[in-house]
């Protein structure tokens, strides 16, 4: 569904000019006193809106799908921790919005020799790992990143618990 105002209500955000299909609040753990930031996907682009400002700012464009799955995380940038919003869909792959300057970066995931150009339809976060499912060509696979490293998904043979990887869980009855 698309976001729209209900009868008798007022807008929480300024009009974007295109139907918003994904809306996420940017969680600011490292900068809790900053104004709330919202991230929207509409018309093949990613926008941000900072509460109290005049309108949406286009941060990147050229996407095939406006429906994104997302999780919040942290990254180290210049020795400091920065909040990030990680988004993914099965058409465009993974991107990240960085809280330091709200830039958007495309991410190419390395998942090992057996997997190339994997793009997740859904993301989750558990035990300091990012989990991805719904990758085209891998309907029975669940992938996971290295702990504390959301963009590295390869294994570590010497210490498997520190690596990323995939779990294949085939099903024959649709469960």
Give the label of every model feature segment.
Residues 1-175:
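Recognizes the extracellular SEMA beta-propeller fold with strongest preference
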